[in-house]
Amino acid sequence: MPFGEYQYSLDDKGRVVIPAPFRDFVEDGLVLTRGMEGCLYVFPLDRWKKIEEQLVNLPLTDAEARAFVRFFYSGAHKTRMDSASRVLIPPPLRLFAGLKEGGEVVIAGAPGRLEIWSQERWWKAIEEVLAKPPAPEALKGLVG
């Protein structure tokens, strides 16, 4: 599982370098899509196939399920790292995540995925957790 956080700049073509510790995780291809809290999720292809299997089984009669699938699946973009370990982030996904050419980007590991954040949104998300940390009971059995 990928973990850690790394800062890079988005180049003038909308590309970002995948950090060396994460490259093996996505070496066979990846899918970029909209994530929660205004970030992008990056899934390796094998993980994405499992997610697709779960999405196809969501009930069409459930409006919330349809809305989530629309949000999550319609924004998906399959790609690969180039020879310099960069990934092109399509303009609609850059817009969604608030990523600007030349701007600072945080790439963070998470269980089963990577997350790509604008630096500003990343620190806002971290500050929100610090301002209102989860109750110890919610973490029972997970930490410690």
Curated annotation (Swiss-Prot):
Matching InterPro entries: MraZ, MraZ_C, MraZ_dom, MraZ_N, MraZ_sf, SpoVT-AbrB_dom, SpoVT-AbrB_sf
Entry keyword set: Cytoplasm, DNA-binding, Repeat, Transcription, Transcription regulation
Cellular location(s): Cytoplasm, Nucleoid
A single GO BP: negative regulation of DNA-templated transcription initiation
SpoVT-AbrB domain segment(s): 5-47, 76-121
Any GO CC annotation of this UniProt entry: nucleoid
UniProt KW Ion transport keyword: no
This protein's record includes keyword Ubl conjugation: no
Signal peptide from the UniProt entry: none
Entry-linked PROSITE patterns: SPOVT_ABRB (PS51740)
GO terms assigned for molecular function: DNA-binding transcription factor activity; transcription cis-regulatory region binding
Source taxon at top rank: Bacteria
Oligomer and partners: Forms oligomers.
PANTHER family (alphabetical): TRANSCRIPTIONAL REGULATOR MRAZ (PTHR34701:SF1)
HAMAP family: MraZ
Family under the similarity heading: Belongs to the MraZ family.
Protein name in UniProt: Transcriptional regulator MraZ
The species this protein was found in: Thermus thermophilus (strain ATCC 27634 / DSM 579 / HB8)
